[in-house]
Amino acid sequence: MRRQRPSVATARDAPSLEVYNIIPIHDFLTEHPSLRYPEVRAAAAALRIVGDLPKPPFADFTPRMDLMDWLGLLFGFQIDNVRNQRENLVLHLANSQMRLQPPPRHPDGLDPTVLRRFRKKLLRNYTNWCSFLGVRCHVTSPIQSRHQTNAVLNLRRELLYVALYLLIWGESANLRFMPECLCYIFHHMAMELNKVLAGEFDDMTGMPYWPSFSGDCAFLKSVVMPIYKTVKTEVESSNNGTKPHSAWRNYDDINEYFWSKRALKSLKWPLDYTSNFFDTTPKSSRVGKTGFVEQRSFWNVYRSFDRLWILLLLYLQAAIIVATSDVKFPWQDRDVEVALLTVFISWAGLRLLQSVLDASTQYSLVSRETYWLFIRLTLKFVVAVAWTVLFSVFYARIWSQKNKDGVWSRAANERVVTFLKVVFVYVIPELLALVLFIVPCIRNWVEELNLGVVYFLTWWFYSKTFVGRGMREGLVDNVKYTLFWIIVLATKFIFSYFLQIRPLIAPTRALLNLKDATYNWHEFFGSTHRIAVGMLWLPVILVYLMDLQIWYSIYSSLVGATIGLFSHLGEIRNIDQLRLRFQFFSSAMQFNLKPEEHLLSPKATMLKKARDAIHRLKLRYGIGQPFNKIESSQVEATWFALIWNEIILTFREEDLISDREVELLELPPNCWNIRVIRWPCFLLCNELLLALSQANELCDAPDHWLWSKICSSEYRRCAVMEAFDSIKFVILKIVKNGTEEESILNRLFMEIDENVENEKITEVYKLTVLLRIHEKLISLLERLMDPEKKVFRIVNILQALYELCAWEFPKTRRSTPQLRQLGLAPISLEADTELLFVNAINLPPLDDVVFYRQIRRVHTILTSRDPMHNVPKNIEARERLAFFSNSLFMTMPQAPSVEKMMAFSVLTPYYDEEVMYRQEMLRAENEDGISTLFYLQRIYEDEWVNFLERMRREGAENENDIWSKKVRDLRLWASYRGQTLSRTVRGMMYYYSALKKLAFLDSASEMDIRMGTQIAPEARRSYYTNDGGDNTLQPTPSQEISRMASGITHLLKGSEYGSAMMKFTYVVACQVYGQHKARGDHRAEEILFLMKNHDALRIAYVDEVDLGRGEVEYYSVLVKFDQQLQREVEIYRIRLPGPLKLGEGKPENQNHALIFTRGDAIQTIDMNQDNHFEEALKMRNLLESFKTYYGIRKPTILGVREKVFTGSVSSLAWFMSAQETSFVTLGQRVLANPLKVRMHYGHPDVFDRFWFVPRGGISKASRVINISEDIFAGFNCTLRGGNVTHHEYIQVGKGRDVGLNQISMFEAKVASGNGEQALSRDVYRLGHRLDFFRMLSFFYTTVGYYFNTMLIVFTVYAFLWGRLYLALSGVEKIAKDRSSSNEALGAILNQQFIIQLGLFTALPMILENSLERGFLPAVWDFITMQLQLASFFYTFSMGTRTHYFGRTILHGGAKYRATGRGFVVEHKKFAENYRLYARTHFIKAIELAIILLVYAAYSPLAKSSFVYILMTISSWFLITSWIISPFLFNPSGFDWLKTVNDFDDFIAWLWSRGGLFTKADQSWFTWWNEEQEHLKTTGVWGKLLEIILDLRFFFFQYSIVYHLRIAENRTSIGVYLISWGCIIGIVAIYITTIYAQKRYSVKEHIKYRFIQFLVILLTVLVVVMMLQFTKLTVVDLLISLLAFVPTGWGLISIAQVLKPFLLSTVVWDTVISVARFYDLFFGLIVMAPVALLSWLPGFQNMQTRILFNEAFSRGLQISIILAGKKST
């Protein structure tokens, strides 16, 4: 939906009310906290140094304008682009100057060092580009001069260059994906700027020189639009990405055009629109693909990683040669040694293959301008042929001489030496590469030299590319990952030789030596048994090529666990371990989160590092002074309490803990003259009772002995002292001042204090009386907490306490006169007849929040008997506290102050997902009667109770009020438990909240912090009191709640907001927000609500303005909510050259919003992610990592750990969560260190913003090829010399798909993306430019993982087809009689599959869980997962990955698949599961099942049940999991009634005719056509290979017909041809029946029935005659079905490939009809086990238990959910 163009008056507010984004740069007189910083004023003032710059012609340049305005008028930039980049530049310069160490001498002026560093960083890519092309850089160096004027001019010139680049970047729209294109634009515009600054004259006019374009939107119209239209034309010609990649130019092709000087010659400046680069020229003469051509072929996996395959194939050849020899060691036999030389012939042959692949895929790059490429491709082919021939000739000469001499004569040995000399010449380049590998710094230096000599020397090996140079790591990292891979490769090769290759030698020889074997069919290739040998070796070779992935998985898991162990992960695994280290926790928090006082000199760095390391060691192991020695009055204790309490309050706001748990967890401030630190109650529980017990046992022991026993536990000491001080204060508080009772009490406490000081407690008092005093004190506190406050009871208790303390407590009983003399009894005579305290009680009012809160705390300390192991009760709260506390003992950079930290932004792309759950959504029920809210109430039961408690405190009287008064809170509560935008926004805004509070603590004085603890209690909430033992919590009249409770928020003075805003911005790229607003979508209102509640939130969207006449203008708009105006306001509106989406939608959405981000870093956050307040506190530490060298480079991407928060919903979600967790933790840990190949995988990584801005941004967007857009940011980073690290002391929450269908769609999306990656230029360049061992790491963690997963499935296919061939051909029977090795072979192959299944998925999870949760819990979790059939899920997922990865490489068809992020508890219908899994799993499983059944019928080995089971158990497991998993993990999947309904629904769907607009879920025909979409876009080779693969189905018929009795053991080819006659007859009968049905079934039904009768009669007659007059049996008929059914499916599959030729013929109707019957047949096969299990009693309950076992273990009533019974 588009809106009309806004008028000028409404487009923007009046100038006096100009809207600003973060800081009001336009008006420095505004009262804004950011403007108090001199650095901000200095940066803005520097921009106003216009001086004597010439005024742009035809423009109104006013004195108020600055350099940005001048550039905007000079080059025609948009006004809002200028405003946007002005703030961007000022903020960055100001933040950079704040961090400057030592601080500048003149803080009111911009330090030139800051600007110079920024200019070098921002323009480094441009300067490298100029050096690469050999052109002069137009950024002139500043003049070194101390003269003030020159310094100002230099500063201005630097500012102009930086500002010019930012303005170009800010308005380039989609061109930002092409960084070298921007370099080209900047290069020429900087040249024009230099001419203007130099005052040069135009050669044509003789007038002062001005840029070639100017005016309103001149840059957009003259530069951006022509290039944009070219990109747009290319994308449109791709037919929505379905055409081959080689047929059109994508972003990378157009960008790489600027990697050569021909761009400078062709495009010129101003741009020559007639150039063949632009879309103005015909496609035939236009510039084609540049740099690389993406061809769709499996050969890409070999071509990109040829070094790996050469290694594997050459070792395989060498191992076979050695294994076939009869010597123990190869050096014992010269024949074997010489035979090993054939590996060099193979090596040369593989190089020849590589050259052929290069030429066949990249030929379209050749043109008149790139003739050197043609020469290189040709020469490489010729040289490869020459080496192959040369090696072959020299090798043949060796054997000819040896055969001639009969022995290894001297002449023969000389020819061996000659051969080795040739080998030496051949491997010289490899030796040179080895030398450079050992000294990587030299290789980096050579590669980065832009010299013609270097290009000439490397021309043969590499194409000249701007990226992929200088990628070697440092020597230390080099050694680490080299050792890792040497160990892995050594293990793999030893295992392969002894357990794979050698065991096959004997069976191979036995087969080749079979001379008298006869085949059971017509054998086309004689009786050499080579096909049988090939079938024997094929699965072994596939396992050999694949199992390096297994060994990598094993060793990477071990290394990852070891690194995690040394990183101190998992040392605090639970709350109990946190209790033990809580005393050191505060010191650790202060050490890491509290900034140090920076010295003026940055020296002594190594000394500081050593001191920090020692301090961290002391903290970690409790050495030195812990926190228990710090008194409660010290600022450090208060600082820690403020942060800790803020974390606890955040938990309460998230409803993770209850009000009562807040009281138990919080660290209250000092009050009531308590002399010790007031530890959280959950630490002090039971400690006082233990102290009383010790006092009772040691009542006669000396004081120091008793006190030392109590002090053995710091918590016990504090509990005793706090209890005494609190009781003392409480009793004196409730007694009136000036009364005699007060005097007595003061004297009594004074006496006790004196005895304590003199260590006479045990000497003077009877400690056994303490227990009675304890009971009375508890009664007193309970009466005080009673809302009714019955004073007479309190008087009685006080009187009893007085008598105990005055009369019974002392060992020496004192008389009344003695007590009066000591001041411990009333002096007046009346007091003898009156009770004490009757008229002396003055209870505090009920609104005294502090008093009653402390009363409850003291009561808890006095009464708690259990150790409170379940505080907090919520699992997520416990895990978060444990991780946060553990992370503070890990190594991390120390945090700077907020003012000196690096600024950063968070960017989240959003399209149209849920923002908040609406009221109707929460109430809507599914077919089982389950609403979303009901589901959440059961899953998050404790959190729902906490929410209700909070709502009651905030005014809700009952649950009905929640649906009226508190419906917004209800919606938010539900939304925060789903994968919604509101959850993500809340999590990211914790950064803002944390920075505000940290900024206050950084700048607060000691008095401010002390005030925080004094003011806080008065603003605290009062929680609930316990009424007389009843567990029902009753609110007290004095209840209130406030964020002031932590003692921070209420102290914020305003400047903290400015600091936080300058350091953090959150931009959500809501691409269609404008459309949502225009049509009144509820999501627009909800997004506005989020902006209103979060100051730092900004929304970027694309606005489409209809100009009429079919013209539309597109604008990138940034909006915020103005708290003063109380409405949404528009900040920037920047016109785009056209529609936003040319490539993939998500990166385009990110790209348009990227210009609105701020800061040095940018964190990419997806819509399904979350964050926590306690983690946000550590962001300053993380950003400091950008300043540290990791290896030889500083990081450009900081990897952040993820915590999957959707693992507790169901067992299926747990499986996915466990798999994902091991990948995002252990996997990423190893990739970063030691392997140094971590990329960006869509994680919440933090990018160095100004490193990526000039290098193409944070993702790639080319259509289809970049469908996995995020990982290409990592590829691009590595290729351009970046460094990616991984940090596990901070984590971000992440949601994962929780239903099988959702998970499958996600797996399909990722697998398809990897299929496209395999074709991409980035993967090819990384495969060639990384050193050998990093290349191995890269392969096995990206494309190789999916390729090897596919090889696993291929191995199963090859093994089963091979066994079938051996069985049906008769070779197996003959071999069985002479050898039993084949049985061992089957066991070996099955062990391989089981090893893969276990180690691929289990080992990383077990080790990571062992590290973070402990070994026994990890083993128990693994056993539990197996009992819940996790292996079924992982095997099923393997099939999904295999299907989509293979199909994408072969045919394409990758697309974005919306997985959905809802809650999955509803039952999925059979038809839906069939549509999703029929082609990916069901048909493949049925095929394998038929193979096993045929094999069981005809194999002599299968007659032994044990051998058959041993050989096929893993295959049957795979078949079972592929068929049954969609129903096993489907709620109510085995409910009989649902199964019956599903079958009816499936039949109705199958026979639905459909129509033009019918969807796939409504009609089988529509779905069937959609399943063939990939065949429409595939190439000729894809179709040909598909047909070749489909030919396998004909093998069933070929092999089985010869085993029928009617064949009479004949092996003539005629038997097979006759069987085709039967198929033709069956098809003819079917066609006749279908034709009769269409022609006569409606109007002439009798004719139709007559024809049916004739057909049936004729068929029965033919069958009876054959049974009577031939040897055909009924069994033959049944077996023929096994033969003809696969043949029919093969014919249909081939017909689908040939659809363009058959569509217009009558054959196609028959194909459709037969295909429908086949899907009915397959559906019935799949439905059969489901129906059987549904019919069996009790199986549904078992399935529910399996699926939701995790929920059961947490006490959730999933059975109630599934039954839809809402219990009240």
Swiss-Prot record:
Listed EC numbers: 2.4.1.34
Superkingdom, natural source: Eukaryota
GO cellular component terms listed in the entry, alphabetical order: 1,3-beta-D-glucan synthase complex; plasma membrane
Effect of deleting the gene: Plants develop collapsed and inviable pollen grains.
Parts of the chain that traverse the membrane: 309-329, 336-356, 371-391, 422-442, 481-501, 531-551, 1342-1362, 1387-1407, 1414-1434, 1482-1502, 1509-1529, 1584-1604, 1613-1633, 1650-1670, 1674-1694, 1720-1740
Listed SMART domains: FKS1_dom1
Extracellular topological segments: 330-335, 392-421, 502-530, 1363-1386, 1435-1481, 1530-1583, 1634-1649, 1695-1719
Cytoplasmic face residues: 1-308, 357-370, 443-480, 552-1341, 1408-1413, 1503-1508, 1605-1612, 1671-1673, 1741-1768
PANTHER family for the chain: CALLOSE SYNTHASE 11, LYST-INTERACTING PROTEIN LIP5 DOPAMINE RESPONSIVE PROTEIN DRG-1
The protein's name: Callose synthase 11
Organism encoding this protein: Arabidopsis thaliana
Gene: CALS11
